[in-house]
Design a protein with these regions (language model features):
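Substrate-recognition "cap/lid" segment bordering the active-site pocket of phosphatases
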Residues: 108-116, 121, 135, 140-192, ...
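Hydrophobic alpha-helical core bundles mediating ligand binding, dimerization, or RNAP-core interactions
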Residues: 25-36, 54-58, 80, 103-110, ...
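Short, acidic loop-to-helix structural element flanking the phosphoryl-transfer center
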Residues: 6, 73-77, 92-100, 104-136
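Acidic, Mg2+-coordinating phosphoryl-transfer loop and its flanking beta/alpha structural elements
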Residues: 190-217
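A metal-dependent, Asp-based hydrolase signature
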Residues: 56-104
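Active-site neighborhood of HAD-like aspartate-dependent phosphohydrolases
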Residues: 2-56
Length: 217
């Protein structure tokens, strides 16, 4: 139809936008705490307290990772090592070994958790039916983000999953956004970034000339 506006190309963040990172992470942490940590750590330490401290330290590590101060391989065990320190547990050899084991177990377990943000499937299905091309643009690790997509049922709705690992740049770096345009043939005025992170998703997209949708439930 003459004059009909082309449907926007929608680029979704994954964690905390579609995939319920907090609930899935806590489910995985609860399981690995009971399996690996509870037999070793003081009986007075509850899983709830462990998770509370972990979430604080994990966010600090992710900020450092996004700033280029940590590598992926450094982040995975370090967030658990710092959790132990935050709990006041002495940093002796066994604790470093436990932190390494928990880091490996978490990455193996968490991606297979399947809780989504409420109504996520219904929303992306409706958008797909309306003719939007849809993609994922995430700072998460390549190997785990694809597992999340497949196991949670999101995969069929998205043409390409772009990860910072594969791109070589993390949001909000402009190269992350320009790479997506180059690969999809989209242009800034047709591209919309939808995500929960104000700095990475919204401001990053704004600086690249994209439209933005801030998911802030």
């Amino acid at each position: 139809m003459k004059g009909q506006q082309k449907p926007s190309d929608l680029f979704f963040d994954l964690d905390r936008t579609l995939w319920d990172f907090d609930l899935n992470s806590r489910e995985a942490l609860h399981a690995i705490f009971e399996e690996l940590a509870a037999p070793i750590l003081p009986a007075s330490l509850t899983v709830a307290h462990f998770i509370d401290v972990y979430e604080v330290e994990n966010e600090k590590c992710w900020r450092a990772y996004r700033a280029g101060e940590l590598t992926q391989s450094e982040l995975r065990p370090l967030r658990f090592q710092r959790t132990m320190e935050g709990l006041g547990i002495p940093a002796f050899k066994e604790m470093h070994s436990l932190a390494d084991s928990m880091g490996e177990a978490y990455v193996k377990r968490a991606p297979y958790c399947t809780r989504l943000i409420p109504d996520a499937i219904e929303v992306v299905r409706t958008l797909k039916e309306r003719g939007h091309r849809m993609f994922i643009l995430t700072n998460g690790f390549d190997e785990v983000q694809h597992i999340k997509m497949k196991n949670s049922g999101l995969d069929p709705f998205f043409e390409i999953v772009f990860t910072s690992d594969a791109i070589g740049h993390k949001k909000p770096h402009p190269e992350a956004f320009s790479h997506c345009l180059n690969q999809t043939g989209s242009i800034p005025r047709h591209a919309v970034m939808i995500g929960d992170d104000l700095e990475c998703d919204v401001i990053g997209a704004l600086k690249s000339g994209w439209r933005q949708g801030h998911f802030n439930p």
